[in-house]
């Protein structure tokens, strides 16, 4: 049995998201969550999923959503980020079935100061639900980790109450992920603050599970967003196993992995770190920085190779009257970026044991 025996292709929601994550947890793999900022980056990720016969998660950050709506657009009141996220969701919904893979449409890190963005997406979900019987987005991520724990959990719980009638999946963060990500800057925190305690996980699980089964937890185990040299970050994904054991004991259950965990700050981490996390119940891994660099690699190499064909519309080493349109056509050099990004997503799918799970 594979994933397509239990969920459909295209954007999935509600119980199908729960089925997908449960299947991943039971079969020992995780699904890459790729940040997309355009139709081009979305296609690059979808191409990888199709080639690997794997599910995929596509997510828009606040800044990525703003870019989707036009970088020069005013984002007063988060209106551009709201519009960009909605546009991305509609686009991905329309194109995803063509690729023949299940897709989770997700919104990434929403800090407290960005909650108007979240509210705008929820309004779009509710409007879409009235017509189609399902939300526009599959899931949303609330990052209130900068707030006191009690406030963090209470506010996430309120959003869960709003989400549960539509069966929207909610991802939350407890503990601090270092570095900087759209709207959340934790680059100043000490390493000792980057580790969540088992009691924290239980507090979250106890409160949210009283409202909804559709939630996952991004626990901190030394994670850092962005670019860093190997060895500079002390990741301890095995801590997630201790968290699972603690929650199992509190629940008095036979399920060794009752919690759906998320691995943040995945760019630059080792394959062993990923796979240790997966063994401990990680079902989603965020990848952004690595795919950004992979995209620019293809464009960079193309520009360097054909630089003499990109200076003027006409005239190149082959002759002063030779046209260059076939070289500067955006469809050509943008596709070079897509190809190298697709290759990087394929690597993630292999690292996370996601290949051929359909």
From Swiss-Prot:
GO terms for cellular component: cytosol; nucleus. The keyword Ribonucleoprotein does not apply. It catalyses: beta-D-fructose 1,6-bisphosphate = D-glyceraldehyde 3-phosphate + dihydroxyacetone phosphate. Binds 2 Zn(2+) ions per subunit. One is catalytic and the other provides a structural contribution. The modification Phosphothreonine is found at residues 289, 312, 340, 342. The keyword Transferase does not apply. GO terms for molecular function: fructose-bisphosphate aldolase activity; zinc ion binding. Zn(2+) 2 binds at residues 143, 173. Pathway: Carbohydrate degradation; glycolysis; D-glyceraldehyde 3-phosphate and glycerone phosphate from D-glucose: step 4/4. D-glyceraldehyde 3-phosphate binds at residue 61. It holds the Pfam family F_bP_aldolase. Zn(2+) 1 binds at residues 109, 225, 264. The active site is at residue 108. It is an enzyme of class 4 (lyase). Its cofactor is Zn(2+). Keywords: Glycolysis, Lyase, Metal-binding, Phosphoprotein, Zinc. Its EC number is 4.1.2.13. Dihydroxyacetone phosphate binds at residues 226, 265-267, 286-289. One of its GO terms (biological process) is canonical glycolysis. Signal peptide: none annotated. Homodimer. Catalyzes the aldol condensation of dihydroxyacetone phosphate (DHAP or glycerone-phosphate) with glyceraldehyde 3-phosphate (G3P) to form fructose 1,6-bisphosphate (FBP) in gluconeogenesis and the reverse reaction in glycolysis. Belongs to the class II fructose-bisphosphate aldolase family. This is Fructose-bisphosphate aldolase.
């Amino acid at each position: 049995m594979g994933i397509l025996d239990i969920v459909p292709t295209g954007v999935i929601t509600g119980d199908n998201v729960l089925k997908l994550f449960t299947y991943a947890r039971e079969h020992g793999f995780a699904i890459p969550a790729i940040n997309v900022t355009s139709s081009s980056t979305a296609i690059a990720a979808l191409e990888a999923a199709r080639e690997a016969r794997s599910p995929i998660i596509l997510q828009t950050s606040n800044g990525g959503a703003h870019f989707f709506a036009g970088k020069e657009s005013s984002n007063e009141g988060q209106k551009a980020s709201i519009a960009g996220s909605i546009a991305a969701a509609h686009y991905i919904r329309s194109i995803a079935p063509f690729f023949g893979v299940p897709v989770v449409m997700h919104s990434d890190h929403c800090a407290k100061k960005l909650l108007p963005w979240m509210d705008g997406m929820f309004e779009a979900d509710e409007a879409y639900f009235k017509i189609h019987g399902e939300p526009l987005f599959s899931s949303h991520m609330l990052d209130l980790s900068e707030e006191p724990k009690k406030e963090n959990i209470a506010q996430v719980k309120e959003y869960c109450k709003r989400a549960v009638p539509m069966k929207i999946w909610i991802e939350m963060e407890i503990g601090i992920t270092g570095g900087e990500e759209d709207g959340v800057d934790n680059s100043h925190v000490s390493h000792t603050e980057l580790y969540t305690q088992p009691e924290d996980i239980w507090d979250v699980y106890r409160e949210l599970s009283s409202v909804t089964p559709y939630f996952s937890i991004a626990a901190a185990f030394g994670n850092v967003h962005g670019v860093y040299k190997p060895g500079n970050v002390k990741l301890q994904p095995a801590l997630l196993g201790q968290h699972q054991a603690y929650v199992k004991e509190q629940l008095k259950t036979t399920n060794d992995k009752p919690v759906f965990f998320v691995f943040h700050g995945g760019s630059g981490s080792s394959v062993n770190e990923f796979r240790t996390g997966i063994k401990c119940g990680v079902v989603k891994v965020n990848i952004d920085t690595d795919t950004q660099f992979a995209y620019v690699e293809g464009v960079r190499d193309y520009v360097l190779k054909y630089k003499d064909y990109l200076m003027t519309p006409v005239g190149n080493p082959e002759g002063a009257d030779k046209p260059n349109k076939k070289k500067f056509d955006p469809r050509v050099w943008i596709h070079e970026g897509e190809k190298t990004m697709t290759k990087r997503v394929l690597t993630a799918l292999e690292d996370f044991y996601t290949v051929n799970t359909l």
